[in-house]
């Protein structure tokens, strides 16, 4: 079976170059070196004041008809900043997260892998599990808080319509509750430590 055409992405906001180097660039360097299947890598940005000038990253403010060959990653920057309001009001995150579906459909990707910019895949076992995931909407369990962790998700093409239905609810509706309790996951993988901060190993 041929691998699914895969989009790997994180969401982003960085105030300056130091923040970019410490977080998003570090995320890129780590995940680009893994045997994680991907056909394109995007950093989807909530109108940061800083825009990277790294030679292997192409900055986009609109989706072109076809992705140019050459860049190792694309930095898609929205023109306006949504940000965050209180605990659940992650407007910027929701917009960036859901825009991954627009990218996938625009370029024929069949699987979306979301690894948040402060999350890192640390074992070959979880990389192999993600590579082998070809259906459903998968999240990984966070035992520290007893919820699925939305910082690590795999959305296969059979769930793209479900993701579109989430997007149709709009940012105002989506930001009244935690993403952990809102996203309609079809599979929650409990055999892994799905934590960003290392509270549970």
Enumerate the language-model features and the residues they cover.
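N-proximal low-complexity "stem/linker" segments adjacent to membrane-targeting elements
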Residues: 1-29
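Acidic donor-binding/catalytic loop of UDP-sugar-dependent glycosyltransferases
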Residues: 117-131
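Short beta-strand-to-loop acidic/aromatic patch adjacent to the donor-nucleotide binding site
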Residues: 85, 108-120
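Conserved donor NDP-sugar-binding/catalytic core segment of glycosyltransferases
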Residues: 106-107, 127, 131-140
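Active-site-proximal specificity loops/subdomain of glycosyltransferases
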Residues: 44-107
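Catalytic core and acceptor-binding pocket of nucleotide-sugar-dependent glycosyltransferases
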Residues: 121-124, 142-152, 158-201
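Short loop->beta transition adjacent to catalytic acidic/histidine clusters or analogous donor-positioning motifs
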Residues: 5-6, 32-42
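Well-ordered, non-membrane alpha-helical segments in soluble/globular domains
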Residues: 20-31, 93-98, 124-127, 175-182
């Amino acid at each position: 079976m041929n691998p699914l055409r895969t989009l790997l992405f994180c969401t982003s906001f960085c105030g300056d170059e130091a923040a970019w180097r410490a977080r998003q660039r570090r995320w890129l360097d780590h995940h680009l070196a893994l045997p994680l299947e991907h056909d394109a890598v995007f950093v989807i940005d909530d109108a940061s004041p800083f825009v990277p000038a790294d030679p292997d990253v192409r900055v986009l403010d609109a989706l072109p008809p076809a992705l140019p060959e050459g860049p190792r990653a694309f930095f898609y920057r929205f023109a306006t900043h949504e940000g965050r309001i209180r605990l659940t009001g992650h407007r910027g995150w929701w917009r960036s997260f859901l825009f991954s579906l627009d990218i996938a459909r625009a370029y024929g990707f069949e699987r979306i892998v979301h690894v948040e910019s402060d999350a890192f895949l640390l074992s070959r076992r979880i990389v192999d599990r993600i590579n082998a995931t070809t259906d459903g909407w998968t999240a990984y369990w966070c035992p520290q808080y007893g919820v699925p962790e939305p910082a690590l998700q795999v959305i296969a093409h059979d769930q793209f319509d479900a993701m579109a239905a989430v997007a149709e609810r709009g940012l105002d509706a989506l930001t009244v509750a935690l993403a952990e309790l809102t996203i309609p996951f079809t599979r929650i993988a409990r055999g892994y430590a799905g934590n960003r901060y290392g509270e549970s190993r």
